[in-house]
């Protein structure tokens, strides 16, 4: 038995999140204390199968569909709760994804503390 974490969590995602990481994002998005931040994920994750065509080419495809709680197919990716510009911060002092996530967590924690004081 482990520890149950109920504090705010931010999961950073981009188009490089696919397959099992896409499934992880889906499961995390369903939790009330989690916000997904970034750009739409790369999708996939529906039990990938591989096969070889008669000409020798290899193909890989999802053998099943995966749906979110609303019934939407996630094969083409998951849209984050907080969508950021798809930008690379090469040479920048501050990574825009990390900065946005830190700001979100700070605001979120302050809201929680404010509600606790009122109780």
Question: What feature does the model see in each segment?
Answer:
Residues 1-119:
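C-terminal "post-core" interaction segments
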């Amino acid at each position: 038995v482990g520890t149950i974490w109920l504090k705010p969590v931010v999961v950073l995602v981009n188009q490089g999140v696919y397959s099992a990481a896409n499934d992880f994002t889906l499961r995390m998005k369903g939790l009330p204390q989690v916000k997904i931040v970034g750009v739409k994920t790369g999708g996939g994750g529906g039990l990938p199968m591989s096969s070889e065509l008669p000409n020798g080419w290899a193909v890989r495809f999802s053998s099943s569909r995966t749906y979110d709680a609303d019934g939407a197919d996630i094969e083409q990716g998951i849209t984050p709760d907080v969508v950021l510009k798809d930008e690379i911060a090469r040479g920048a002092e501050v990574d825009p994804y990390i900065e946005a996530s830190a700001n979100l967590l700070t605001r979120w924690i302050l809201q929680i503390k404010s509600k606790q004081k009122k109780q």
